[in-house]
């Protein structure tokens, strides 16, 4: 039988939880303490909190910010008992977007590569946060490729058209300071994924 590590169990629990996509919403800035800043999104009768760290902290000053898209995922930890998300903030679309990026999945075990496959990755925003891309791809890999079960680790590479790439190591959660990074979707050339057998 496959022995699933504690790390894989933790990652699976995080990436398998529900996410919420807010489109064209307004965020309100609140300072909890001088060094701690949150954006609040009002959703019906509840308020969802987004911790602003890194670039987001500088970018979103006091007051009200309109026309935002937000990809919201609860973090494992809480702040003063309240759940919160980190990053995932982009500007709302100026125009409708309906793109497909091709994702290639290579399966590997101790002898090397043994299988590959393709799937379409749907894009409906002009800009996407790395948080959203990382979360959606890992969720798909959990549901369809046994990630954090039979396949324990690997790497996602999002290649850009002209130069550069973004890499996500599948044996660790996306770093908090990358959750607010944003990519223009027209820059995405292709997505390459390697999943490695436990």
Predicted regions and their residues:
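Long, charge-rich, low-complexity intrinsically disordered regions
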Residues: 53-96
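N-terminal, helix-rich and Lys/Arg-enriched segments in bacterial and organellar proteins
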Residues: 1, 167-170
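Generic structural motif
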Residues: 18, 140, 159-163, 173, ...
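Mature extracytoplasmic domains of secretory-pathway proteins
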Residues: 24-62, 92-165
